[in-house]
């Protein structure tokens, strides 16, 4: 005998469906194992991995997705502290400019727009700004900003609006599009970028995203930090719930489990459960975005792994491995 559709039963049905959706999202979470080709430019070899997103484009086309290049330069124009920082960070990222140059050249040779999802620079320095300017001087770029774009010394202070403001203007002057929010249509597909590097979505960004949805075009969102999905959470944590996921919009029950320790007053921000905790606007944005049928895909970085996880009924989220590792994704859009 079917249950009467009263308010309580409807609530129970919705709870069951949400639970099933979460299980399906986790089941279909995958580490991307895509078709890969190699490309060499001036002695530097990169790997290009192919993925496909079906969105309903006016005609098929491709873009090159790169993230986390981490330029690591400093010179006499910077402080001694910054020069030492560059030397230390360069131990694992010293070839970042030759690699991003090879990736850019691949895009130019194949007439591909480049979608870069943040952390082009590892920290703000005059030498890094010059290097970023060289990189952006050629090619067709769509850029989202990462958390490192405005980092002065990498992890030395609380990252918030006031911290970002210290270097925002000089960074924005070098980059090819607005770093807070930007949109561009290619072959009937609306590419939207927004700054979520500090794990927050602002009310202004939320309002602008609603306006983009109202255009009625299929949307591919490009951002630095991945949006929370149960599948990506599983891939990153591998059963260890204390491991931070680096995702935006994670439920409080998830972030509260992240490893943290007692700190002195004013230093609590150093704990990931505080740093990555979503505010009300961010949680509301995340829930709202999952319901938007216009959203067809998300391109992101930050976590330095290749993955494809289900964000919503209409959109998968693709993270790409760190660009300084010589990896990028050729995204074919249909």
Name these PLM-found stretches.
Residues 1-9:
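Short, Lys/Arg-enriched N-terminal segments with co-localized hydrophobic residues
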Residues 34-127:
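N-terminal active-site segment of His-dependent metallophosphoesterases
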Residues 41-55, 125-218, 234, 238-254, ...:
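Extended active-site neighborhood of metal-dependent phosphoesterases/phosphodiesterases
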Residues 19-29:
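Bacterial N-terminal signal peptides
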Residues 102-113, 192, 199-307:
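His/acidic metal-ligating clusters that form di-metal
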Residues 67-98, 151-174, 231, 274:
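Acidic/histidine-rich helix-loop elements
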Residues 68, 118-119, 146-147, 224, ...:
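Active-site glycine-centered loops adjacent to acidic/histidine catalytic or metal-binding residues
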Residues 9-21:
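Bacterial N-terminal signal peptides that target proteins for export
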